């Protein structure tokens, strides 16, 4: 059912998913999302490289060489292209009115490189004015077990999940979904959001706290870009359902690791603990 009217609702309940830039021989992202197609969703590929198109079509996936040719509204795209190409893909997605996209592509501000920072700022400057729902970059994107959208080929498909999980780490997102599923605890929705340059943790919490398919919210967070908003959103969420927060970067070594991992700046631990107590 989701949260009709919420800016993230189409992305969390997609009817059309597009994988951009997948490559053989495994075609990981298309293979991960085959259950979405099998459940009746529209799964398409956008790939310009002629060497890859035959392999994509052998999977039974229709490929397009232009975003403008993809039929119907694009609810969610998974983008796996070199970082220098990312702004061009984002431009095309915005031009066709796509709702949102997860950018698996890394190599942005988390590297500390001038080019990476510049490219990340370019994505932000393009996405925000367009009100485009950019997940990431440097992330695994969405896992929606009820409709068959996955960021890992072993993640279970299940209709009974009631746990919403958010993770700034792709590895933690994958491992939690696998371990939880192996122990009979299925997820309702999961987002791995990496650098969180447009959509921040607060945006996902705001959705999950209103989602009647989610009874409890768990999260792994390395940092919030707007601490006050995160506090207010978390406070409201806790009135509605249980929330479990796992904070990364709590030591000096951990803080350095999160900076190089997702570009998250360390926050004062006492301030963080005070916020959690409130």
What kind of feature is each model-predicted range?
Residues 1-278:
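Catalytic-core regions of core metabolic enzymes
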């Amino acid at each position: 059912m989701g949260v009709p009217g919420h800016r993230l609702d189409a992305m969390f309940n997609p009817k059309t998913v597009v994988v951009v830039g997948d490559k053989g021989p495994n075609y990981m992202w298309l293979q991960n999302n085959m259950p979405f197609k099998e459940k009746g969703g529209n799964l398409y590929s956008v790939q310009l490289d002629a060497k890859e198109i035959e392999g994509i079509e052998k999977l039974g996936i229709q490929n397009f060489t232009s975003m403008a040719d993809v039929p119907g509204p694009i609810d969610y795209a998974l983008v796996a292209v070199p970082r220098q190409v990312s702004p061009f893909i984002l431009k095309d997605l915005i031009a066709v009115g796509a709702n949102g996209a997860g950018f698996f592509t890394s190599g942005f501000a988390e590297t500390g490189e001038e080019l990476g920072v510049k490219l990340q700022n370019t994505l932000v400057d393009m996405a925000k004015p367009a009100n485009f729902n950019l997940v990431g970059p440097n992330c695994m994107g969405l896992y929606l077990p009820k409709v068959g959208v996955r960021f890992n080929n072993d993640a279970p498909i299940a209709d009974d999940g009631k746990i919403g999980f958010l993770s700034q780490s792709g590895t933690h997102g994958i491992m939690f979904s696998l371990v939880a599923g192996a122990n009979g605890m299925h997820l309702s929705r999961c987002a791995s959001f990496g650098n969180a340059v447009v959509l921040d943790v607060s945006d996902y919490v705001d959705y999950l706290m209103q989602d009647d398919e989610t009874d409890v919210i768990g999260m792994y967070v390395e940092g919030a870009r707007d601490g006050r908003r995160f506090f207010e959103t978390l406070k409201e969420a806790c009135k509605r359902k249980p929330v479990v927060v796992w904070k990364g970067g709590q030591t000096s070594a951990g803080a350095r690791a999160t900076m190089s991992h997702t570009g998250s700046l360390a926050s004062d631990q006492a301030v963080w603990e005070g916020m959690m107590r409130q």
